[in-house]
Amino acid sequence: MSIRPLHDRVIVKRKEVESKSAGGIVLTGSAAGKSTRGEVVAVGKGRVLENGNVQPLDVKVGDIVIFNDGYGVKAEKIDNEEVLIMSESDILAIVEA
């Protein structure tokens, strides 16, 4: 996949997260709801500050992140794969191993 986000934008590939119902049944796909976790596949150069300097992003390619899946997050198909384009501010946390 070849895509380069601009400024503070981040490209994230959603990760399927397995979840269980209250009765212990494993839910996958649409029954589990959309995951708000994903892997960062591309990052922009950073946020341009008022003084013209560029503040680098905290996230990097390969990070697993938890994000706010709401207004401002745009889904796109690139090479038949769905990816999400979002600002770094839409990312709530980086999952550390």
Curated annotation (Swiss-Prot):
One of its GO terms (molecular function) is protein-folding chaperone binding. Pfam families: Cpn10. It is found in: Cytoplasm. Disulfide bonds: none annotated. One of its GO terms (biological process) is chaperone cofactor-dependent protein refolding. Together with the chaperonin GroEL, plays an essential role in assisting protein folding. The GroEL-GroES system forms a nano-cage that allows encapsulation of the non-native substrate proteins and provides a physical environment optimized to promote and accelerate protein folding. GroES binds to the apical surface of the GroEL ring, thereby capping the opening of the GroEL channel. This is Co-chaperonin GroES. It comes from Serratia proteamaculans (strain 568). The lineage of its organism: Bacteria, Pseudomonadati, Pseudomonadota, Gammaproteobacteria, Enterobacterales. The gene is groES.
